[in-house]
């Protein structure tokens, strides 16, 4: 079989992934019998067979693609399926000895930092400089730290040394933009930002801590150029299949080029209408250069409403003189207020499903920016009508779950000097949560201590003390006999557990992770019969706690007098209470068939989901957020694109990029809907301002919903 690499290019839902799977099947069939080839590949120098390296744009796509490839060849050939960042992370950790040898670092196993931990440690490290040089309101400090850390990630993904970030900022952005976005009033803004980044990177490497930005830089700058590592790549893999390369970082192109240089059989797919992660860490135009080294396989199939109506839609939003009307497949749903729009949208979905026009799983509600009010309102109304909703990548703060709040309050009672983190209202909530032991006729957990009784107990039986808060005996409450036997028994059981655990902790210095695990097993009945969202929150809490104390242990190795254990627990509790950690643990549902439900998400989430539906509801259709990147665009991302280095990013360039993004978004969404688009418009937005975005012309050109 020819080893000429293949470049599969086509629009949304044109069959690119299917074609990639087909090429993989043909390649495997063309190889010697898989069992024989696997045995021949085994030797003393290479104990494992060379596998195929497969890339996918995100974790959801990765799992689906891995399943398709395995089914295509009935598991007869080994594959390694990763996202680009996942692969780089694994490689940096696997070949860490090569890195610390070249950098002269301490020989210690690296620890990957989660974004929230990275934020916390960087804020602490930069606090003196922020106070001295940067005039920031406290409310903007979080955003400032996040944006500076994102600069390191953008630079690493594009192959720019951290030392050059200040230069890129100075050349690529105006002083006005820097001051406006970063809220800095110093003349040497880029230099000071660069100093913060270098300080953070060096501090992290000394302690073996790896953030995403540091991982990117370590890979392209130190690991990938190492000839010993390159030899290992050649020994481990014999081909590469990369799906949706328009969502890959620039340094991925260098890796893929390396495989092409060594005549690896390679297949790539590229979507000109995609570029979903452009503005984050992706550099699709740079990746497209790989096409010049490949045999081009164009796919011209256009799916959904895009086949007939994409040009009409684009003409309406771009040409002010275009006076056409939209066909019957487009319907406008208009109200005055946003609240009314949410109710009317939910009602329209309920009516359509109840009347049998469309099934719930055939509907997607897509918004440019889905705020919590809209998410909650739509989910409450639809689920109340018996229509399930599947929110895409829902990331509610962990602290929004009452079980998590109760467990954090429990830590404040077991460990000393944490009384300020256990107010009376938190104690009352904890008593309610830990007394859920009865079931009603509808199989709902009923607490033995209801909120009223819990409030009375917290008022009379809780001893507030900053150093040693305690739950007193139930008879401390003069009218304890009015509480009832069930409430008193449940309260005494909780008190007995807390006092026993406190005694064990004082004797054996128990880790908070052990205390949390014991509380989940004994006070929450090991999570038995809890709904999935609560189980996910508990799993994420334990994963977060494990990660937090691993990092704490590493910091204590470098700084023995780092801080007291109570201060560490206090920081952990406050970190979660700030709401920066969400319930998004490693997925457990990938083998469970999802129930029929309405899909709900923002534009970025829906496009990344790479699905399609019969009906689309485009929420807030006239919002200006449709033509803006919003949260899917990081600050200063364009100045790190490989195709436009050292070009100043101007307002005109930003407007041009916004228009190009809007056209890609509309073409992409229209290809993902097959029957009807309901354009949901309210005259007033969330903030009460008029909604006059570019898609208003679509609303005006469509027939109104009856």
Identify the residue ranges that each predicted region occupies:
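Accessory C-terminal helicase-associated subdomains
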Residues: 190-191, 468-602
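Helicase P-loop NTPase motor core
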Residues: 12-32, 303-385
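ATPase/helicase motor core of nucleic-acid motors
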Residues: 357-362, 367-499
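Accessory N-terminal region flanking or inserted into the helicase ATPase core
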Residues: 5-8, 125-240, 330-336
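Conserved P-loop NTPase-based nucleic-acid remodeling module centered on helicase motor cores
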Residues: 48-160, 164
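Conserved helicase NTPase motor core
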Residues: 182-291, 298-305, 313, 337-338, ...
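C-terminal accessory regions
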Residues: 619-701
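Conserved helicase core region in the C-terminal RecA-like lobe
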Residues: 83-87, 240-246, 540-544, 550-561, ...
């Amino acid at each position: 079989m020819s080893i000429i690499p293949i470049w599969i290019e086509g629009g949304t839902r044109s069959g690119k992934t299917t074609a990639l799977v087909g090429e993989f099947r043909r390649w495997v069939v063309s190889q010697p019998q898989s069992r024989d080839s696997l045995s021949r590949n085994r030797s003393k120098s290479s104990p494992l067979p060379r596998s195929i390296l497969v890339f996918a744009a995100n974790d959801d796509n990765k799992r689906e693609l891995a399943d398709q490839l395995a089914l295509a060849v009935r598991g007869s050939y080994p594959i390694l399926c990763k996202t680009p960042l996942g692969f780089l992370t694994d490689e940096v950790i696997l070949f860490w000895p090569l890195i610390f040898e070249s950098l002269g670092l301490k020989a210690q196993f690296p620890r990957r930092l989660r974004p929230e931990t990275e934020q916390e440690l960087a804020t602490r490290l930069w606090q003196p400089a922020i106070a001295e040089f940067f005039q920031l309101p406290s409310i903007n400090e979080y955003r400032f730290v996040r944006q500076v850390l994102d600069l390191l990630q953008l630079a690493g993904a594009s192959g720019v040394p951290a030392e050059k970030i200040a230069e890129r900022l100075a050349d690529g952005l105006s002083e006005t933009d820097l001051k406006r976005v970063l809220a800095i009033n110093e003349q040497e803004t880029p230099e000071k930002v660069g100093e913060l980044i270098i300080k953070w990177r060096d501090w992290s490497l000394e302690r073996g801590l790896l953030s995403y930005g540091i991982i990117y830089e370590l890979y392209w700058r130190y690991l990938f150029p190492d000839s010993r590592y390159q030899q290992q790549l050649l020994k481990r893999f014999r081909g590469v299949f990369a799906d949706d390369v328009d969502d890959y970082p620039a340094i991925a192109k260098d890796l893929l080029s390396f495989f092409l240089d060594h005549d690896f059989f390679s297949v790539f797919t590229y979507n000109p209408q995609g570029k979903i992660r452009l503005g984050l860490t992706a550099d699709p135009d740079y990746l497209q250069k790989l096409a010049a080294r490949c045999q081009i396989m164009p796919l011209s199939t256009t799916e959904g409403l895009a086949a007939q109506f994409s040009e009409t839609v684009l003409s309406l939003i771009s040409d002010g003189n275009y006076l056409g009307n939209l066909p019957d497949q487009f319907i406008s749903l208009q109200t005055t207020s946003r609240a009314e729009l949410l109710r009317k949208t939910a009602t329209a979905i309920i009516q359509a499903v109840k009347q049998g026009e469309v099934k719930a799983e055939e509907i997607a509600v897509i918004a440019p920016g889905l705020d919590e009010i809209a998410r909650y309102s739509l989910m409450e109304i639809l689920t109340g009508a018996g229509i399930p909703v599947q929110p895409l990548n829902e990331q509610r703060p962990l602290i929004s779950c009452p079980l998590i709040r109760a467990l954090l309050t429990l830590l404040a009672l077991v460990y000393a000097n944490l009384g300020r983190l256990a107010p009376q209202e938190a104690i009352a909530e904890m008593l309610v949560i830990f007394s859920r032991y009865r079931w009603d006729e509808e199989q709902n957990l009923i607490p033995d201590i209801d909120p009223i009784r819990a409030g009375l107990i917290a008022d009379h039986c809780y001893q507030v003390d900053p150093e040693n808060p305690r739950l007193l005996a139930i008879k401390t409450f003069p009218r304890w006999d009015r509480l009832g036997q069930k409430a008193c028994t449940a309260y005494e059981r909780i008190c007995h557990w807390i006092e026993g655990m406190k005694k064990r902790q004082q004797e054996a210095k128990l880790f908070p992770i052990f205390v949390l695990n014991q509380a989940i097993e004994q006070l929450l009945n090991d999570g038995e019969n809890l709904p999935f969202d609560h189980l996910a929150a508990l799993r994420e809490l334990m994963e977060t706690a494990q990660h937090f104390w691993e990092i704490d242990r590493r910091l204590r190795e470098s700084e023995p007098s780092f801080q007291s254990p109570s201060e560490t627990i206090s920081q952990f509790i406050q970190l979660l209470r700030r709401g920066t950690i969400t319930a998004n643990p490693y997925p457990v549902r990938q083998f469970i068939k999802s129930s029929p439900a309405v899909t709900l998400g923002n534009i970025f989430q829906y496009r990344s989901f790479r699905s399609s539906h019969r009906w689309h509801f485009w929420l807030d259709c006239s919002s200006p957020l449709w033509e803006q990147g919003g949260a899917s665009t990081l600050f200063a991302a364009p100045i790190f694109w490989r195709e436009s280095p050292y070009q100043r990013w101007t307002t005109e360039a930003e407007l041009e990029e916004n228009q190009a993004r809007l056209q890609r978004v509309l073409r992409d969404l229209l290809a993902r809907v097959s029957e009807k688009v309901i354009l949901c418009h309210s005259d007033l937005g969330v903030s009460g301002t008029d909604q006059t975005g570019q898609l208003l012309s679509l609303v005006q050109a469509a027939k109104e919903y009856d």
